[in-house]
């Protein structure tokens, strides 16, 4: 059974909550490769814009060979890389620290997006009401950053992109309790 709302009254319209939901939806449906795109196109997008633990730790983008092996799900040599340690960056313009924030707004699937947005709607309006719009945005982004960094600490060598607002929404849920 999924909740659709809560019983906590709010005193203000949750404009920021609605804006965050709209932003995540627009990014998923307009900016990210379509759900019908190949998984390779989606993976390429995620490797360019999502936080990747090993990149966050080292402060530099993955090499082309490391990203290719991650996108294809094979070893670097099977991906056609003769020198697995190649230092040519896959996404040279990628700002690995900024990706910690941008990854909060990316989602892996429609179910991932809908689940996160449902819980953002249920809990976000109460937090926004309490913290006011600017405080809520700061709290939401801080929750996403802390969750992403927690993921990085749990597996700092991971080359798998971290996406989704689950950490930011978990912070919202915990603050309601």
Identify the role of each PLM range.
Residues 1-177:
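A detector for small-residue-rich transmembrane helices and their helix-helix packing motifs
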């Amino acid at each position: 059974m999924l909740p659709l709302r809560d019983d906590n009254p709010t005193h203000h319209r949750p404009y920021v909550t609605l804006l965050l939901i709209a932003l995540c939806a627009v990014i998923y449906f307009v900016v990210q490769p379509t759900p019908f795109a190949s998984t390779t196109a989606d993976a390429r997008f995620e490797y360019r814009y999502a936080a990747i633990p090993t990149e966050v730790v080292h402060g530099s983008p993955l090499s082309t060979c490391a990203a290719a092996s991650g996108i294809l799900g094979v070893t670097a040599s099977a991906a056609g890389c003769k020198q697995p340690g190649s230092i040519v960056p896959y996404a040279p313009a990628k700002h690995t620290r900024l990706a910690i924030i941008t990854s909060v707004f990316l989602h892996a699937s429609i179910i991932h997006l809908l689940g996160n947005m449902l819980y953002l709607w249920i809990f976000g309006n109460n937090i926004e009401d309490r913290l006011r719009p600017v405080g809520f945005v700061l709290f939401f982004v801080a929750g996403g950053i802390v969750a992403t960094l927690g993921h990085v600490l749990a597996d700092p060598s991971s080359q798998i992109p971290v996406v989704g607002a689950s950490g930011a929404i978990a912070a919202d849920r915990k603050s309601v309790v």
